[in-house]
């Protein structure tokens, strides 16, 4: 009986540890230029799972990352200008974010965590950002098209 209890405790501990080890870190760079043009988050679309983190890394100055749309129950974020930020995404859904100084250039991105439970509100946020952008109008829409319903 004592040996069985030890095995049970060990199995539970291993399951918990492996669950934490499976969480991934995704890196998004904030750049003046990249594969998708000027003033970009790279990559602009990230597919993640609940518990994953996204690390926004400042490559060039004068950028930040601010959430615009997050799923119900999720916490938004806002980094200061010239600072990166790491965000843990625990809630399933679509997260839309932007760079405040370069929103007019449609410097924005999309993260899908698990199921797209807030697809419609995320689409509305993308449409609003795109309508307000002076340039790169297809960029954010292209990222959002990668969201799987």
Question: What is the predicted role of each segment?
Answer:
Residues 1-9:
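Bacterial N-terminal signal peptides that target proteins for export
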């Amino acid at each position: 009986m004592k040996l069985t209890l030890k095995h049970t405790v060990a199995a539970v501990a291993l399951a918990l540890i492996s669950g934490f080890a499976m969480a991934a870190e995704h890196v998004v760079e904030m750049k003046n230029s990249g594969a998708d043009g000027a003033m970009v988050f790279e990559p602009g679309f990230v597919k993640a799972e609940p518990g994953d983190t996204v690390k926004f890394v400042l490559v060039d100055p004068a950028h930040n990352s601010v959430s615009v749309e997050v799923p119900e129950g999720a916490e938004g974020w806002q980094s200061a200008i010239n600072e990166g930020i790491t965000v843990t995404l625990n809630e399933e859904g679509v997260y839309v974010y932007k760079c405040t100084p370069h929103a007019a250039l449609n410097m924005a991105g999309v993260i899908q965590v698990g199921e797209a439970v807030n697809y419609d509100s995320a689409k509305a946020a993308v449409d609003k950002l795109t309508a307000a952008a002076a340039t790169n109008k297809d960029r954010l829409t292209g990222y959002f098209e990668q969201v799987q319903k």
